[in-house]
Amino acid sequence: MDEETAYELERQKTIAENRALLDSLGLDPAGASSPFGSSPAPTSNKTKPKPKPAPKKRKAAAVIAVDEGPRRRSGRIAGLEADGDAFKAKVEEEEKEREILRVVSRKEREKVMDVGKMVEDTPEDEIKDMEKYLQSIAELSNPRTYPAGTVSAREAYADSDTVPSEVQRLKDAFKDMSLKGNTKVTNERVFSMCVHPEKTKTLVLVGDKYGQLGIWDALGPPMEKPENEDDTSGLLRAEGEDEYQEGRVWRVQAHAKNSISCMKVDPVNGSGLFSTAYDCSLRHLSFSTLQSTELFSFQDEDLLINHFDLLPSAQEAWMVDKNGGISHWDTRESKRESGRRRWVVQEEGRGAKLGGVSVNPLMPHLICTAGNDQHVRIWDTRHLFSISSNLVPSAAAIEEEEEGTSTLSGQSSSLPHDTHPTRESDYSTVTSYLASPRGKGLMRAKWQHGKSCSSAYWDPWGRRILTTSYDDHLRVFNIDPGSSLVDDRAVGSLLQPNGFKPTKVVRHNCQTGRWLTILRAQWSLNMEYMPHFTVGNMKRTLDVVSATGEKIVGLWTDDVTAVPTVTASHPNIVDRVVGGNTSGRIQLWSSGDHI
């Protein structure tokens, strides 16, 4: 009780002191004079926090008048009338300056360019070495191997090369694989890659995110290491081992500052490289003449060319774009005027994009396409040329029309090196033809995946199709010798339910996300062994898989720290494969010590 009495006396004393303080300040203890109205009585004896002292006012610095020069003012608001000629000249001059900046920033390529002029920030002696090396490659004939033309289609489609003994033979070829090279070939993320077929060399050609072509002579003499430059090989070298043991690298700005979407070595003799990019062009780089030539291009920069493939003659190419178009380029003399055409086969929208196209090496009139609408389709291109089309105004015709001079009606003006399509068939025209009796054989087969289909490729024999899909599966479609693809009398059989479906399904994580290049399983072009393909694995391995769906080998070491999303194989050396990653680094794998 004594403690409670003492506490109560102390509390009353505190209340009295607080009331006296409020009275001295002229404040009502009940809060009636507060502008915020009454507030509930305090429930505790917490002391009121002390008010913070007001910050000291800083003296404003003296304003110093600075002559900022003339300011831009609106002539329209000021009511001034611009001099017509002077104003027009000024606008044209500003437009020219913007165009120059655009060309410089995009690194736009001319129609025909010398390779030496496409190399940037490289010493002259290294450019000469590159030119000499490419010309030495051109002197070596390396035609691509195709199925024998004497074999009938029905015999060729017999599935007799996937017996267990062939699978074991392939596994034996990939024994004792090891990492032979790990070199930064391009400055940016790898988008596409291929290996030249020359057996005595390992020439890897790499396309990156910004139109740069990396040329890697993996077995060539090492380049001298520049002074004060850190090692970027990425391999753990043994003590005393010389640096730069991984060949020579040259970098060429092959396209404008856009991703190189696809590359193919000239199938006739290996003396050049065909490539497409998001700058909407198809180009050919000749190793013998050392010139890069534009073969095909779109005026509309929104029509990104996603993929292409060549016919065995290398005189024709099929391309697919973002807006659902299939385009054809033909350089033969008889097709000079009509050799550039486009057909829109996908309806406009998110599913319009065609991400892949492949030409059947046994029957080149058949192509397969991979679409964002989840479908893989097989087309008979012989029917496409029967579809009605409209003339596409060329750049020259548009300029003439703007200047008041027009070409004759019904004719399409062309420049000496005009590469734009001359005719186009829109989606409604294509679908109308497809629904007509004449268009019965245009689409030979189709199959729908669970999600978008990223790629579709015919194997080197023309007997199977390999697809990659975002539904996390790789699929192999075997062609029946009695199907409509082989026998024209059975047209339409593969369009029936269950008429065309995968024979092998391999589960594979294809969720690359935003920052990795899309996975595309790629057939090996080597025809000395059973059909097999390579594909990057999200667990950072490079997988080799047979056409039967059996995993042959998964390649990985501690030195590989990124996913090899882009893969390729040496066409004539079965156990030599490469993988490329986001940093522009390429890993070369091979077995034994012969490399």
Swiss-Prot record:
A Gene Ontology MF term for this entry?
DNA binding
Which superkingdom does the taxonomy of this entry point to? Eukaryota
Q: Name one GO cellular component term.
A: nucleus
Kindly list the biological process annotations in GO that this record carries. Answer: DNA damage response; regulation of DNA damage checkpoint
* Gene3D superfamilies per the UniProt record, alphabetical: YVTN repeat-like/Quinoprotein amine dehydrogenase
Composition bias (Basic residues) maps to 47-60
Ranges of Basic and acidic residues composition bias in the record: 417-426
Each WD repeat occupies one of these ranges, namely 185-226, 255-297, 300-339, 349-389, 448-487, 519-556, 558-595
> Which controlled-vocabulary keywords does the entry list?
DNA damage, DNA-binding, Repeat, WD repeat
Region (Disordered) spans which residues?
Answer: 20-79, 397-429
Q: Where is the composition biased (Low complexity)?
A: 29-46, 405-415
SUPFAM superfamilies in UniProt: WD40 repeat-like (SSF50978)
> Which InterPro entries does the record associate with it?
WD40/YVTN_repeat-like_dom_sf (IPR015943), WD40_repeat_CS (IPR019775), WD40_repeat_dom_sf (IPR036322), WD40_rpt (IPR001680), WD_repeat_DNA-damage-binding (IPR050853)
Question: Do the record's keywords include RNA-binding?
Answer: no
* Keyword set includes Metal-binding: no
Q: Which PANTHER family match?
A: WD REPEAT-CONTAINING PROTEIN 76
What's this protein's family per the entry? Belongs to the WD repeat DDB2/WDR76 family.
Its biological purpose is as follows: DNA-binding protein that binds to both single- and double-stranded DNA. Binds preferentially to UV-damaged DNA. May be involved in DNA-metabolic processes.
Protein's name according to its UniProt entry: DNA damage-binding protein CMR1
